[in-house]
Amino acid sequence: MEVKGEIYRVSGPVVTAIGLQAKMYDLVKVGNEGLMGEVIQILGPKTIIQVYEETAGIKPGEPCVSTGSSLSVELGPGLLSSIYDGVQRPLHVLLEKMGSFIQRGVSADGLDHKKLWDFKPIVKKGDSVKGGDVIGVVQETVNIEHKIMVPPDISGTISDIKSGNFTVVDTICTLTDGTELQMMQRWPVRRPRPVKAKLTPTRPLVTGMRILDGLFPVAKGGTAAIPGPFGSGKTVTQQSLAKWSDTEIVVYIGCGERGNEMADVLSEFPELEDPQTGRPLMERTVLIANTSNMPVAAREASVYTGITIAEYYRDMGLDVSLMADSTSRWAEAMREISSRLEEMPGEEGYPAYLSARLAEFYERAGVAESLCGETGSITVIGAVSPPGGDFSEPVTQNTLRIVKVFWALDAKLSQRRHFPAINWLNSYSLYKDSLNDWFADNVAPDYVPLRERAMEMLQTESELQEIVQLVGSDALPDDQQLLLEITRMLREIFLQQNAFHPVDAYSPFDQQYKILKAIMKWGDAAMDALKSGVPVTEIIKLESKNVLAKVKYEEKFDESMNAVLAQMDKEFASLRGR
């Protein structure tokens, strides 16, 4: 039911209306052009609305109309391969309607209401169904079978069910009480979709990035943050995760970042192959583009839209990864709206409820048993852009309280052209211990001890670097000079990775293990040679060390690795034979 009021005051994206009988978070059409807005505060007769479109030119006295429903997204077949703005308007539809520049007050359906999908029922007349039950399937892409579920708040007995080609708005099932079900369902973005139970994450998200998988793994259903200063590689890391992580669905939210970065994703993803299925990456991806020049209020909507779409696919029993780049821009939008509302500012001007909003978002991640009995997961990876790389600022600190994995990007590493520029001394993962059994069973029994040894060596190196800067490496004992050489190999061969190299961009677990084991084998053999009296200068000159550095770029990895290991054995045998 539509309720009319009128505009009383306009302050940037915040509009005050009077005479509008609306509820909190109701969707409102603002002004003569019908701009999309959402009720965020009610003060007696005044209703405060945040508007998701540019408010220039609207004035007091213009009408405000409440739609009576909250901001919702359309969920159903056709989400994959789509690119939306922050409020689920398909950008290709907006392009057809008005060209390259988006005008205001234009609405578009989130899903294509005319496209036909082949619906195959898996229930029959007379069956009882409840919220979350699967009534049929649609082949959405070659690899994704889309399960059509009963909306969570509906239950009953089936009186009629159809089979064949239908659009998402056609009635495919009728219950005895007259309720009609379509392939599409609408869901309010601020309300988490219900689940039977939340479960403990026990499987790692395989990213193909050696430093993440090897040293700081995130579990499927986990939460991770990538904070870092400008130019340290947040977006490239996020895009690498979106390209190569082993989840069935990827939701990528460009929240307040540069438009060119979204353009990169759009140009690259259709050409790249998913390493798990061999299909184009775009077939498993939903993109939400809310760039820095779009209205700030829509940044909040884009984050909630993305997580709601992710929850929908999780309910089908799929593993979903969600990349939000960057949550700092969302926090800045909250700060702007909060100041327009004249609320009491918290630290650095951010609203006092900043941590509550961030927690609300990250807590929607996790492994869950859905209402239909399937187990799915949402892994949320949020980039944070602290001004000047200051990790003590409120957004980073509040994020760190919530997430369990911290990948700290370091400007000094990026200046040295060490990418990914993740500082191995500042980063951590709280999922390590719970994933150790998986690594022992699926990678190698000695993988975890190898990883711990590598971390100890890297920490010892950082302590030795202080002495080296004072007196030089030649003043160190021979065993410590050799340790510095082994850790240099760890950094340059194992931790460094080229995100733009056709082979090195994605490193499977067995390759990661073999590279790490080869470096450790070289280090152990070098230490044995040193103890038997071989000078450290002779050991450092060995050619196998340089050949090992090139193995990660080889397409025939196993052949190259076996050749290097044979060369290594030969060189150390000749050293000992002198």
From Swiss-Prot:
Its main location: membrane. One of its GO terms (molecular function) is proton-transporting ATP synthase activity, rotational mechanism. One of its GO terms (cellular component) is proton-transporting two-sector ATPase complex, catalytic domain. ATP binds at residues 228-235. The keyword Membrane applies. It holds the Pfam family ATP-synt_ab. InterPro entries: ATP-synt_VA_C, ATP-synth_a_Xtn, ATP_synth_asu-like_sf, ATP_synth_asu_arc, ATPase_a/bsu_AS, ATPase_F1/V1/A1_a/bsu_N, ATPase_F1/V1/A1_a/bsu_N_sf, ATPase_F1/V1/A1_a/bsu_nucl-bd. The keyword ATP-binding applies. Gene3D superfamilies: 2.40.30.20, 2.40.50.100, Bovine Mitochondrial F1-atpase, Atp Synthase Beta Chain, Chain D, domain 3, P-loop containing nucleotide triphosphate hydrolases. SUPFAM superfamilies: C-terminal domain of alpha and beta subunits of F1 ATP synthase, N-terminal domain of alpha and beta subunits of F1 ATP synthase, P-loop containing nucleoside triphosphate hydrolases. Its EC number is 7.1.2.2. It is found in: Cell membrane. Keywords: ATP synthesis, ATP-binding, Cell membrane, Hydrogen ion transport, Ion transport, Membrane, Nucleotide-binding, Translocase, Transport. It catalyses: ATP + H2O + 4 H(+)(in) = ADP + phosphate + 5 H(+)(out). Produces ATP from ADP in the presence of a proton gradient across the membrane. The archaeal alpha chain is a catalytic subunit. Has multiple subunits with at least A(3), B(3), C, D, E, F, H, I and proteolipid K(x). Belongs to the ATPase alpha/beta chains family. This is A-type ATP synthase subunit A.
